[in-house]
């Protein structure tokens, strides 16, 4: 059965939980992971790499993220209120297809729902990213991505918020 691992934290967690519910209503298993610090995960992983490089005769150290995700299956989607570069810093240690949504672009003054839709981190965009990742991974054949874009009411012709 297809499975999605959703990463979220802080105020975006509500969007991630709603996306999980929407995925599960479609028969797609979804686990939610609370990421309190992408920077700390990155630093820990880099420290382990350094240790392993400098101590080749010692037992290798495993990064915390590898310990947590090492046995997980499925695809991974990170949704963040920060730029995509922040969650992307842990990409080398993600054991599957990894899709990142973030708020790249210039600031706007709007209500949260409008901003989340504008920056493509709303539950609908998280669901789309998850199902697209499953389709790209060959794990899901029940819903075409183009049909889902239409169903979710996403305007695919809208400008990229990072460039708008």
Language model region names:
Residues 1-164:
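Thiamine diphosphate
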């Amino acid at each position: 059965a297809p499975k999605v691992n959703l990463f979220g934290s802080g105020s975006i967690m509500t969007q991630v939980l709603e996306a999980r519910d929407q995925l599960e209503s479609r028969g797609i298993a979804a686990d939610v992971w609370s990421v309190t610090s992408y920077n700390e995960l990155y630093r820990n992983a880099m420290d382990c790499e350094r240790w392993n490089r400098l101590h080749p005769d010692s037992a290798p150290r495993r990064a915390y993220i590898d310990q947590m995700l090492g046995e997980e299956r499925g695809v991974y989607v990170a949704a963040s209120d920060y730029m995509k570069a922040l969650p992307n810093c842990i990409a080398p240690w993600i054991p599957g297809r990894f899709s990142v949504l973030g708020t790249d672009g210039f600031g706007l003054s709007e209500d949260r729902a409008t901003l989340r839709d504008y920056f493509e981190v709303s539950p609908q965009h998280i669901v789309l990213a998850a199902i697209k990742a499953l389709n790209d991974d060959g794990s899901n054949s029940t819903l075409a991505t183009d049909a889902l874009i239409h169903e979710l009411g996403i305007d695919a012709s809208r400008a990229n918020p990072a460039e708008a």
